[in-house]
């Protein structure tokens, strides 16, 4: 059993479909960690520009 989140209303459920809006719920697991970060350069640039 995995926790799922409705993409339409944002509510969490353990069922396949949301009980409120009957939309198919998706997984809420974060993406797998990889030491080869394809977007790390862009995240650091954004973080640096937001500090200013």
From Swiss-Prot:
GO molecular function, a single term: snoRNA binding
One of the GO biological process terms: pseudouridine synthesis
InterPro entries: H/ACA_rnp_Nop10 (IPR007264), H/ACA_rnp_Nop10_sf (IPR036756), Nop10_arc-typ (IPR023532)
Superkingdom as given in the UniProt entry: Archaea
Cellular component per GO, a single term: ribonucleoprotein complex
One Pfam family named in its UniProt record: Nop10p
Keywords: Ribonucleoprotein, Ribosome biogenesis, rRNA processing
Gene3D superfamilies: H/ACA ribonucleoprotein complex, subunit Nop10 (2.20.28.40)
Biological role stated in the UniProt entry: Involved in ribosome biogenesis; more specifically in 18S rRNA pseudouridylation and in cleavage of pre-rRNA.
Similarity-based family: Belongs to the NOP10 family.
Protein known as: Ribosome biogenesis protein Nop10
